[in-house]
């Protein structure tokens, strides 16, 4: 291990020659992480975690603080970019069999859960209408836990309803969790370099490797530059493209928005939750929609690592991508036919991808077996 650390330090880490642009998302995520920590740090200097002042402090940041509007928009758009990159990163891992590197995959799934928790706490902080009601709906799911549910919810809220203590602790959690993400990212990278990256062919890369620097550093810099330009263009010309109009109104516990929904990057999980007409069942499906990723290394039965030469699994993968998009779309719609039916069918297909993984692997082995 010390030898590998020295190689990383001098940029001489041996990396497969044939890894494609799909392997660039790791460095893009690192850039997003740095951007979020920096902008978040400056925003926290001017933010006030109090239900009477939080909304006003956001207005103060955007209007009165020098470049505050840029910091606030960079932080909001940066979060969306973070999730775009992480979903692409996970899709790459699923397609090219990166999940067979078990420890790396399990640490990565833990990172995803931590990131989703951080983003959820952050969405509550502006104390707008959608912030308040999204927090109410999601935290209320804890009450579905038998016996302990109500006690856990009261403990999380710091009272009998979402109030000042809730906002204060959500701000504290939103501030501390990114440091956990950074620590876990270091573990993720160290575990990755134990065995090295996979490659598009799913073969052993040991026979054909090149130094990480300068080849992959320049390749990374190109996509990082493209990502930063995209973020800056969005911040400059479409800063509110991801915002919900409801969130421009201060939180009012007496007025319920017509359609409560979280940020776009949670819509697929929220859509799965809504598709089940039972509180506990929906909450379990919500948790399982993320946790099912943990099963992938243990259900792989194919002799081939990558999906490059697995047509049946390729079909299921692209069905999963389409399903993910459909669930995200239906979650933005009212809870009424045909949207409920569409999201129920799409949710079943979503879980079918993971359940069919061992069966399709076994079938492909039978088809490709040479006598």
Curated annotation (Swiss-Prot):
Q: Which gene encodes it?
A: MT-CYB
Q: Where does a ubiquinone bind?
A: 193
Miscellaneous note of the record: Heme 1 (or BL or b562) is low-potential and absorbs at about 562 nm, and heme 2 (or BH or b566) is high-potential and absorbs at about 566 nm.
Q: What is its main location?
A: mitochondrion
The reply on keyword Cell membrane is: no
Gene Ontology biological process:
mitochondrial electron transport, ubiquinol to cytochrome c
Q: What is this protein called?
A: Cytochrome b
User: In which residues is heme b b562 bound?
Assistant: 75, 174
* UniProt KW keywords: Electron transport, Heme, Iron, Membrane, Metal-binding, Mitochondrion, Mitochondrion inner membrane, Respiratory chain, Transmembrane, Transmembrane helix, Transport, Ubiquinone
Query: Sorted alphabetically, which SUPFAM superfamilies does this protein's record hold?
Result: a domain/subunit of cytochrome bc1 complex (Ubiquinol-cytochrome c reductase), Transmembrane di-heme cytochromes
Q: Name one GO molecular function term.
A: ubiquinol-cytochrome-c reductase activity
What is its membrane topology?
Multi-pass membrane protein
Gene3D superfamilies on file: Cytochrome Bc1 Complex, Chain C
**Cofactor note text:** Binds 2 heme b groups non-covalently.
Binding positions for heme b b566 per the UniProt entry = 89, 188
TM regions (residue ranges): 25-45, 69-90, 105-125, 170-190, 218-238, 280-300, 312-332, 339-358
């Amino acid at each position: 291990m010390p030898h590998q650390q020295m190689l990383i330090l001098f940029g001489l880490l041996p990396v497969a020659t044939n890894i494609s642009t799909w392997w660039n998302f790791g460095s893009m995520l690192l850039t997003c992480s740095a951007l979020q920590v920096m902008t978040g740090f400056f925003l926290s200097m001017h933010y006030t975690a109090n239900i009477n002042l939080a909304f006003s402090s956001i207005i103060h940041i955007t209007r009165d603080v020098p470049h505050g509007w840029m910091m606030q928009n960079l932080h909001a758009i940066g979060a969306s970019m973070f999730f775009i990159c992480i979903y692409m990163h996970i899709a790459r891992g699923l397609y090219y069999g990166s999940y067979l590197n078990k420890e790396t995959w399990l640490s990565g799934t833990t990172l995803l859960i931590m990131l989703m928790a951080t983003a959820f706490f952050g969405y509550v902080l502006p104390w707008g209408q959608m912030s308040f009601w999204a927090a109410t709906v999601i935290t209320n799911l804890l009450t579905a836990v038998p016996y302990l549910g109500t006690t856990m919810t009261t403990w999380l809220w710091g009272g009998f309803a979402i109030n000042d203590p809730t906002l204060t602790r959500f701000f504290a959690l939103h501030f501390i969790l990114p440091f956990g993400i950074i620590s876990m990212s270091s573990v993720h990278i160290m575990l990755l370099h134990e065995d090295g990256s996979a490659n598009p062919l799913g073969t052993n890369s040991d026979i054909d490797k090149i130094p990480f620097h300068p080849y992959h550093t320049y390749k990374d810099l190109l996509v990082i530059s493209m990502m930063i330009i995209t973020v800056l263009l969005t911040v400059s010309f479409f800063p509110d493209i991801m915002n919900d109009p409801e969130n421009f109104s201060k939180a009012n516990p007496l007025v319920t928005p017509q359609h409560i929904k979280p940020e776009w990057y949670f819509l697929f999980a929220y859509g799965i939750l809504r598709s089940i007409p039972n509180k506990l069942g929906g909450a379990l499906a919500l948790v399982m929609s993320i946790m099912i990723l943990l099963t992938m290394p243990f259900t792989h039965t194919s002799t081939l690592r990558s999906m490059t030469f697995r047509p049946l699994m390729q079909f299921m993968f692209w069905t999963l991508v389409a399903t993910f998009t459909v669930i995200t779309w239906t979650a933005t719609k009212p809870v009424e036919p045909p949207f409920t039916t569409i999201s129920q069918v799409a949710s079943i297909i979503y879980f079918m991808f993971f359940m069919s993984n061992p069966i399709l692997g076994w079938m492909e082995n039978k088809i490709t077996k040479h006598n």
